[in-house]
Amino acid sequence: MLVPSDMIAAQSKMVYQMNKYCADRVQVRKAQIHKQIQEVCRIVQDVLKEVEVQEPRFISSLNDYNGRFQGLEVISPTEFEIIIYLNQMGVLNFVDDGTLPGCAVLKLSDGRKRSMSLWVEFITASGYLSARKIRSRFQTLVAQACDKCAYRDIVKMIADTTEVKLRIRERIIVQITPAFKCAGLWPRSASHWPLPGIPWPHPNIVAEVKTEGFNMLSKECIALQGKNSAMEGDAWVLSFTDAENRLLQGASRRRCLSILKTLRDRHLDLPGNPVTSYHLKTLLLYECEKHPREMEWEENCIADRINGIFLQLISCLQCRRCPHYFLPNMDLFKGKSPGALENAAKQVWRLTRIMLTNVRCLEEL
């Protein structure tokens, strides 16, 4: 098929604009975040070292692997989450019956005594390992460690939350989340994935992702708030971060995500935080299903993919629903105010209109 020369010229201009935007904006953002990460991890490692002295069951898993820290997630340039992996889930069964959207529980295996578990005092009378009880104990230990550590003048615990959150130099927020890694397991609530008839991802990658498994996090679950569920405090939040990152390898998918995050930080950091980098990552995964071929993710297609993701974001904001990629019954907009979502839809449309109508738009964005 012959492609009109003016279309090729427009594509070439957009590729040039994208490359320039990556050099001028995306790389600067990455460099700033990298600098923050070095300080954040140095301070948190010191705090966790103190925690481990008080309670050897909470062993720090925050280690540097060739410049990347295991368990570190960048929420925004000033907000980070660090996952601390706990040991010995052994005598506990993973229970995922769908009654707790986005969550599951860990229950003592039939016939096993509480005393066989490393976490004996956090197991409820019904035999569930309570995520809230573990987090409460961890929060107390971290608070004590902050008072003793070498960085006590610049790191403070954030009060009025059941989460373990630190404020560093009054401007950086770090959440430290206890978790269990569930390798070789795949939750029943995500068993529909991948959808039949969709060629992406490749079956080999699907097998790899399911073997890698998922994480169970001890954190507040917005999906359960207001349900008065007796299980709410005991439930663990399902996290698929490693699976998501594996799926986004190859072609220009990661680059596309970096551009989306940069545009979000510069233009969609709005009151009420209606649009997060995780929303964009989720919609990017859906876009990968719509455009399964590798050639659709080459650099001359990135602008089209970004516009497609923003149009999908507008639709989600207007419908006030953004389904989780692996757990579509879970709404990622739950807890966001209708006013914040409506305002965000207008802002995203303004941004998308600029990108659709001005080939040199990235010079100004």
Curated annotation (Swiss-Prot):
Pfam families: Mab-21 (PF03281), Mab-21_C (PF20266)
Cellular component annotations (GO), alphabetically ordered: cytoplasm; nucleus
Gene Ontology biological process: eye development
Family membership noted in the UniProt record: Belongs to the mab-21 family.
The protein, known as: Protein mab-21
Organism encoding this protein: Drosophila melanogaster
Name of the gene: mab-21
